[in-house]
């Protein structure tokens, strides 16, 4: 499957070392103003090669809108976007053409499809996430019309974690650190891993502010279920928490429940979701990334002929994928919320009658 969503649908295409990466958005309402400057700004947040803490592969990541927009506004038809690949180095992968890289999708892709793209992993490369960010940027424009904003930051690198949530600082931080006092430590850990030809894991928190009540479907398309599915579909993500998440297992009901008052909920252990439906509180999710599997240390593995071999990778890779992962998580949350907002329409007969002029 290469698509996400029920009514607001994102379909992505392209490979890491192909002509480019792109997406098609279907279901975007007509009349939405498309801010191309914002679109490219979001892509620049994900763009590689901007610091010592990400892959040195340099891409301009300027998006070309192919269809679905006229005179700056969506037309209601499929919105197609394309991002050319400009800095591929496929020769870096020639020596491992038949070798399964440990921790990568090479082994599973090969046995599922009978072939695979050895050049940077093809569709399994994080390069594909540029298309998700492009689609998510349009979703953010739509959500802005509804008063919803989404933001994120890194709260953990390796064993070092922080409870501080300074999202304004994260937007200025080269490693997207939520805690100003932890920024240098995060940098040191990433530099240490890179210097040892290794990588390191990390975690981000993403929030949505201005949430309405009622987004999400009961049982089989819950908001938290949809968010978990979208976020777990992101490269290197190994766990997703909503609200208290794993910590809720250590609490009593009296500690975990959020008291409800006239002005709203007193706390937000639920992370903004009850019964799979948004409750109007801020949406809170945490996303945990494994260490980037592309490392330059010798590793034991197999080749396609079944021989045991030693693999030492070349190429250009992120030492900590969580650093650039935040903007992609924001995009996925935006896509899910945009879809849920459209699905929310028609939940009540009165709403349908009013839309068609029968409720008067």
Swiss-Prot record:
| Single Gene Ontology BP annotation | aromatic amino acid family biosynthetic process
Alphabetized InterPro entries for the sequence: Chorismate_synth, Chorismate_synth_AroC_sf, Chorismate_synthase_CS
Entry's EC annotation: 4.2.3.5
Q: In which pathway does it act?
A: Metabolic intermediate biosynthesis; chorismate biosynthesis; chorismate from D-erythrose 4-phosphate and phosphoenolpyruvate: step 7/7
Binding of FMN occurs at 123-125, 235-236, 275, 290-294, 316
Binding locations of NADP(+): 46
Task: Name any cofactors this protein relies on.
Answer: FMNH2
**Cystine crosslinks:** none
Query: HAMAP family annotated for this entry?
Result: Chorismate_synth
Give a short account of what the protein does. This reaction introduces a second double bond into the aromatic ring system.
User: Family per UniProt?
Assistant: Belongs to the chorismate synthase family.
Q: Which protein is depicted?
A: Chorismate synthase
Source species of the chain: Wolinella succinogenes (strain ATCC 29543 / DSM 1740 / CCUG 13145 / JCM 31913 / LMG 7466 / NCTC 11488 / FDC 602W) (Vibrio succinogenes)
Q: Which gene encodes it?
A: aroC
């Amino acid at each position: 499957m290469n698509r996400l969503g029920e009514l607001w649908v994102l379909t992505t295409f392209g490979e890491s070392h192909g002509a480019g990466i792109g997406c098609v958005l279907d279901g975007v309402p007509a009349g939405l103003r498309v801010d191309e400057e914002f679109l490219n700004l979001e892509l620049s947040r994900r763009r590689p090669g901007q610091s010592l803490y990400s892959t040195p592969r340099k891409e301009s990541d300027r998006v070309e809108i192919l269809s679905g927009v006229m005179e700056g506004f969506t037309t209601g038809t499929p919105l197609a976007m394309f991002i050319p690949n400009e800095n591929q180095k496929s020769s870096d992968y020639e020596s491992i053409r038949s070798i399964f890289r440990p921790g990568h999708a090479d082994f599973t892709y090969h046995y599922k499809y009978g072939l695979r793209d050895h050049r940077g992993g093809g569709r399994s490369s994080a390069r594909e996430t540029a298309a998700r960010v492009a689609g998510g940027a349009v979703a953010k424009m739509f959500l802005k019309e509804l008063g919803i904003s989404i933001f994120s930051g890194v709260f953990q690198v390796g064993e070092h974690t922080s409870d501080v949530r300074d999202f304004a600082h994260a937007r200025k931080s080269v490693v997207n650190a939520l805690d100003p006092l932890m920024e240098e430590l995060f940098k040191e850990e990433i530099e240490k891993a890179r210097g040892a030809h290794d990588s390191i894991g990390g975690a981000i928190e993403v929030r949505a502010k201005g949430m309405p009540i009622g987004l999400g479907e009961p049982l089989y398309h819950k908001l938290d279920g949809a968010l978990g599915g979208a976020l777990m579909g992101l490269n290197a993500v190994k766990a997703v928490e909503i609200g208290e998440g794993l910590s809720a297992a250590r609490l009593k009901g009296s500690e975990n429940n959020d008291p409800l008052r006239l002005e709203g909920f007193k706390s937000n252990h639920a992370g903004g979701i009850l019964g799979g439906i948004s409750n109007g509180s801020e949406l809170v999710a945490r996303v945990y990334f494994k260490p980037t599997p592309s490392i330059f240390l010798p590793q034991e593995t197999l080749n396609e002929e079944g021989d045991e071999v030693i693999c030492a990778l070349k190429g250009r890779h992120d030492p900590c994928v969580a650093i650039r992962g935040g903007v992609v998580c924001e995009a996925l949350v935006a896509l899910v919320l945009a879809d849920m907002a459209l699905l929310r329409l028609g939940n009540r007969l009165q709403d349908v009658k009013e839309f068609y002029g029968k409720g008067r």
